[in-house]
């Protein structure tokens, strides 16, 4: 019996689990105990794109704009904005009552410093920076953007969830963008309790009593954020069986990523709700290192893409229910504005094993090792890794599998060292599927070298086409460029698409007000 089968049968049979403390319920203290995808190693949502950090940071930090359930950007920290000079000047005004968790008021210069830090690290932020003449704070309430070229998607970009354009005090925003901030001080509805953090065990967030919510009804990340409980605990439980058993027993309240094979068992429990929260899903991918080793060779990357059967990967990730995934997919997510069929035969009609071996030989591959970082503590990434590694080995690729936890990979993937000095070749990841909608927001298509996301591809042709897409006002020309950028990606392989998966969450039925959108959020949620 495989591991998943063992876990499923073990839960059904009531196998022994470690005892877990009950969350505080009743009286003056109400705690939601949430089991995230993996260990929380940093709260800096600019420094990393880790999903666990994104979800935790959303409680603590705010953004100038937030997206509603339909992903429309709405004012959040700003009261509103005006656009003048044919789109070249944006003036944003902060709303009243904004205060950081250290007691200081939020002022415009905090926002300017925070946004400049974000623009250094984020792909779309870099695009804005390229089009920016000046971002200034003429007074405590006002931000003024002076652009070289119009950028109508500015509010949408500032509302993105990963990497997030979080606003922090100026003293923290002045931290080197490639180093972690020393503190997690935001202005959101919950504050981070650094003194109670235990790596690999828990992270604590407390209601911020001085938070001033917007007056509008909440919809996902737009409107009035209201903390309805006193505390949220992120409890780290790497073992899927233990986590599911704890939820079934009422020892925890919410599983972000239950093992797909355990969904049936969880659905059978009277106190458990199994439902989608992230209704847009996740884009599973492999990211190759474009600087060092065999994966720096585009021919090798094309052969590796050809070796992957997306349906096999998604079946391993989500189990046998095809309604929970879409595969095969290209470099844009199906149903988004830029999705197209250009080059899709590369993933729909895969070459034979012998043909893939011939591709490797033609690329000059001679059995050099590929270091694959395999996160065994992440349910979905673990499954992606296992299928991908087996597929690569099957066509003769020498894979050195390095099994570790996701937190270690989040830190290690920042290294640009060669393989012989502890570097890496590839790792799996999940990106917010809703962002892979066009060449602007599909940031991992970018070929801007050392400024690109981990893996650091350099592709001037892709950058030229991306800029042309942004400058165009002709929908037909943009459609042509959608196809051209996808064809280019099939040639250069900035990342390897594995499919789109739509995992449901599982939570206790006494949690009410759980919001749907593009990620889990903890405001508006009550616990009975």
Where on the chain are the PLM-derived regions?
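Long beta-strand-rich cores associated with HINT superfamily self-processing modules
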Residues: 505-528
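Ligand/substrate-recognition segments at binding pockets and active sites
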Residues: 199, 239-242, 258, 353, ...
């Amino acid at each position: 019996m495989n591991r998943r089968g063992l876990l499923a049968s073990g839960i059904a049979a009531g196998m022994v689990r470690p005892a877990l403390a009950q969350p505080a319920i009743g009286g003056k203290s109400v705690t939601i105990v949430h089991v995230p995808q993996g260990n929380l190693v940093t709260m800096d949502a600019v420094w990393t794109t880790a999903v666990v950090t994104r979800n935790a940071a959303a409680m603590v930090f705010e953004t100038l704009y937030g997206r509603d359930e339909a992903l429309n950007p709405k004012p959040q920290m700003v009261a509103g904005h005006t656009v003048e000079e044919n789109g070249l000047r944006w003036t944003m005004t902060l709303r009243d009552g904004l205060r950081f968790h250290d007691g200081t008021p939020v002022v415009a210069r905090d926002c300017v410093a925070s946004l400049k830090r974000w623009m250094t690290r984020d792909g779309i932020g870099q695009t804005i920076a390229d089009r920016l003449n000046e971002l200034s704070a003429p007074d405590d309430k006002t931000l003024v953007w002076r652009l070289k070229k119009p950028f109508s998607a500015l509010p949408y970009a500032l509302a993105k969830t990963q990497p997030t354009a979080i606003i922090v005090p100026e003293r923290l925003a002045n931290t080197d963008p490639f180093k972690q901030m020393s503190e997690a001080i935001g202005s959101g509805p919950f504050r981070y309790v650094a003194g109670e953090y235990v790596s690999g065990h828990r992270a604590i967030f407390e209601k911020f009593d001085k938070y001033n919510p917007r007056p509008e009804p909440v919809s996902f990340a737009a409107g009035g954020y209201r903390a309805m409980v006193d505390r949220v605990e992120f409890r780290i439980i790497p073992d899927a069986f233990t986590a599911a058993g704890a939820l079934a027993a009422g020892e925890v309240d919410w599983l972000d990523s239950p093992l797909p094979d355990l969904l049936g068992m969880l659905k059978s429990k009277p106190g458990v709700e199994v439902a989608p929260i992230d209704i847009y899903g996740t884009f599973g991918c492999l990211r190759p290192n474009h600087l060092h080793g065999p994966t720096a060779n585009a021919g090798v990357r094309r052969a590796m893409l050809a070796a992957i059967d997306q349906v096999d990967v998604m079946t391993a990730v989500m189990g046998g229910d095809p309604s929970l995934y879409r595969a095969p997919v290209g470099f844009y997510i199906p149903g988004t504005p830029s999705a197209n069929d250009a080059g899709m035969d590369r993933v729909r009609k895969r070459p034979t094993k012998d043909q893939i071996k011939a591709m490797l030989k033609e690329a000059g591959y001679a059995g050099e090792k590929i270091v694959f970082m395999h996160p065994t503590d992440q349910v979905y990434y673990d499954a992606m890794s296992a299928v991908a590694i087996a597929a690569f080995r099957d066509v003769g690729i020498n894979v050195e599998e390095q099994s570790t936890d996701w937190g270690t990979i989040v830190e290690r993937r920042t290294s640009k060292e060669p393989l012989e000095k502890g570097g890496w070749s590839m790792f799996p990841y999940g990106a917010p599927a809703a962002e892979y909608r066009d060449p602007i927001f599909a940031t991992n298509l970018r070929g801007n070298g050392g400024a690109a996301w981990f893996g650091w591809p350099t592709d001037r042709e892709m950058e030229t086409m991306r800029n042309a897409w942004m400058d165009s006002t002709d929908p037909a020309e943009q459609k042509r460029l959608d196809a051209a950028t996808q064809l280019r990606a099939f040639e250069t392989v900035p990342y390897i698409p594995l499919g789109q998966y739509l995992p449901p969450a599982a939570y206790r039925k006494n949690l009410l007000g759980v919001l749907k959108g593009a990620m889990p959020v903890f405001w508006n949620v009550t616990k009975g």
